[in-house]
Amino acid sequence: MDKERIIQEFVPGKQVTLAHLIAHPGEELAKKIGVPDAGAIGIMTLTPGETAMIAGDLALKAADVHIGFLDRFSGALVIYGSVGAVEEALSQTVSGLGRLLNYTLCEMTKS
C-alpha cells in the first residue's frame, strides 16, 4: 500500500493581502480584539510576516494611531484610533509599502 505524501511550503511574496477599516466598532468586538474605546480599528495582513513591523512603523508615523496587535510571524497588524486617523494610516501604509518596497497591493476596504 503506497502512502500519499503532501508537502506544504510557505513561499513568501511581497504582498499586502488585507487592509480593512472597521469604523465605529461595537463595544463587544472592540473588547474582544483588545482595543476598547476605539473609534476605528484597522486590520492588515502582510507577506512576508516581518513586514508587519515595517507597516506598524509606517502607520504610527502617518497618523495618530496606536498598535493594538502586531505579529511578525503571521504578518498581522491591528491599529486603532479615530476613524480619520486609522483611514489615513492604512492608506499611507499601503501606498508606502508599494512605493518603497514594491509590494503587490490590495484595495483598502471598510465596514
From Swiss-Prot:
CDD domains: BMC_PduU-EutS. One of its GO terms (biological process) is ethanolamine catabolic process. The keyword NAD does not apply. Its main location: other. Pathway: Amine and polyamine degradation; ethanolamine degradation. It is found in: Bacterial microcompartment. It comes from the Bacteria. A component of the bacterial microcompartment (BMC) shell dedicated to ethanolamine degradation. Its unusual hexameric shape may help form the BMC shell. Targets at least 2 proteins (EutC and EutE) to the interior of the BMC. Proteins such as EutS containing circularly permuted BMC domains may play a key role in conferring heterogeneity and flexibility in this BMC. PANTHER family: BACTERIAL MICROCOMPARTMENT SHELL PROTEIN EUTS, ETHANOLAMINE UTILIZATION PROTEIN EUTS. Belongs to the EutS/PduU family. This is Bacterial microcompartment shell protein EutS.
